[in-house]
């Protein structure tokens, strides 16, 4: 996919911001090196980034004697961008402060483009993506498929949750069952749930235990209700975190990590809930439809568009029932939308 072309003014602004950050980092680095060399900090230990506040990060200590405590940490300038979910090596200082000296390797990273079109990590070490749909508003293949392709592209297993199960009735029951059957036949896990009746919630909690998860889905499907049910003290925890960590800085809109009372962790932010197809190419899109994979590369023509070309392996698989028509149509619509986005960005 083509990259967004930046104007001279945008390039100048980016460079100016980077220069200012470098100057601040250099000043902070000098102070940190003084603390490190002066023996003012504790021995190195492992920690978990649970939030990001301006130039400081909230790090949860994972080793005694501070295990479970939250520290406000600065970062050494030679460390790449850190995000919520990163495991780090840090050293404790006075007054709940500290210094991050290294980042552990990431198992996974969720990225999205910034306002300049450059991909930036927003969360790390995610184990599963929970795609929330609902009986109302009616779910659509195209939207679910976009989330599934995005999950496949970053290599993070998805789990589909049909929320608002209490709204299933005679008018929509058969269609929803068919919808469910199609994705289960593709090998995707599925949970029926309702925050109103509490059905399916024990099953959901079991899937969340011992994992780090995120919720995605369109507005109105009940993501907030599910999160509030899983985190009944969320507002209190955010307030406590602000008191202990923010120290007058602005309220963050970046991702926060919460420990679920039932086990497991949840990383949440508005940006994460809008997770989607950001800057993927057509090859990645094709590979994101798992049932396409056995047929890719077997078309008669290398530049086959999978529409009406003779010898198209995907069209043949659709005719034989190996690929559902709804999924093929969804693929073509998504590809068209990506092409439109390419054209839009090239004209910026």
From Swiss-Prot:
Gene Ontology CC: cytoplasm
Segments forming domain CP-type G: 116-275
Keyword entries, A-Z: Cytoplasm, GTP-binding, Hydrolase, Metal-binding, Nucleotide-binding, Ribosome biogenesis, RNA-binding, rRNA-binding, Zinc
InterPro entries: G_CP_dom (IPR030378), NA-bd_OB-fold (IPR012340), P-loop_NTPase (IPR027417), Ribosome_biogen_GTPase_RsgA (IPR004881), RsgA_GTPase_dom (IPR010914)
UniProt-listed Enzyme Commission number(s): 3.6.1.-
CDD domains assigned to the protein according to its UniProt record, in alphabetical order: YjeQ_EngC
Cofactor, how bound (note): Binds 1 zinc ion per subunit.
Physiological role: One of several proteins that assist in the late maturation steps of the functional core of the 30S ribosomal subunit. Helps release RbfA from mature subunits. May play a role in the assembly of ribosomal proteins into the subunit. Circularly permuted GTPase that catalyzes slow GTP hydrolysis, GTPase activity is stimulated by the 30S ribosomal subunit.
Name the record gives this protein: Small ribosomal subunit biogenesis GTPase RsgA
Organism: Hahella chejuensis (strain KCTC 2396)
Organism classification: Bacteria, Pseudomonadati, Pseudomonadota, Gammaproteobacteria, Oceanospirillales
């Amino acid at each position: 996919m083509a990259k967004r072309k930046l104007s001279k003014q945008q390039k100048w602004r980016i460079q100016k911001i980077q220069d200012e950050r470098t100057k601040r980092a250099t000043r902070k680095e000098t102070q940190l090196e003084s603390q490190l060399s002066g023996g003012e900090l504790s021995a190195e230990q492992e920690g978990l980034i649970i939030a990001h506040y301006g130039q400081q990060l909230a790090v949860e200590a994972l080793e005694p004697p501070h295990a479970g405590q939250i520290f406000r940490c600065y970062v050494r300038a030679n460390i790449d961008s850190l995000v919520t979910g990163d495991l780090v090596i840090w050293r404790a200082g006075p007054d709940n402060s500290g210094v991050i000296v290294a980042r552990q390797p990431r198992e996974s990273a969720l990225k999205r483009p910034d306002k300049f079109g450059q991909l930036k990590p927003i969360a790390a070490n995610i184990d599963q993506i929970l795609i929330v749909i609902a009986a109302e508003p009616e779910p659509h293949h195209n939207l679910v498929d976009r989330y599934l392709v995005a999950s496949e592209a970053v290599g993070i297993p998805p789990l589909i949750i049909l929320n608002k199960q209490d709204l299933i009735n005679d008018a929509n029951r058969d269609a929803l069952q068919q919808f469910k059957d199609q994705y289960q036949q593709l090998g995707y896990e599925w949970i029926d749930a309702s925050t109103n009746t509490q059905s399916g919630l024990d099953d959901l909690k079991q899937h969340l235990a011992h994992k780090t998860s995120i919720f995605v889905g369109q507005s109105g499907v009940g993501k907030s209700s599910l999160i509030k049910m899983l985190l009944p003290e969320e507002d209190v925890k955010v307030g406590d975190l602000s008191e202990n960590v923010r120290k007058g800085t602005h309220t963050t809109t970046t991702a926060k990590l919460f420990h679920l009372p039932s086990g497991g962790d949840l990383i949440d932010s508005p940006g994460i809930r809008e997770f989607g197809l950001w800057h993927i190419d057509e090859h990645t899109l094709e590979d994101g439809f798992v049932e396409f994979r056995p047929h890719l590369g077997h078309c008669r023509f290398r530049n086959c568009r999978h529409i009406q070309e003779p010898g198209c392996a995907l069209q043949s698989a659709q005719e034989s029932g190996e690929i559902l028509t709804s999924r093929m149509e969804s693929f073509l619509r998504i590809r068209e939308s990506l092409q439109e986005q390419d054209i839009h960005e090239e004209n910026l």
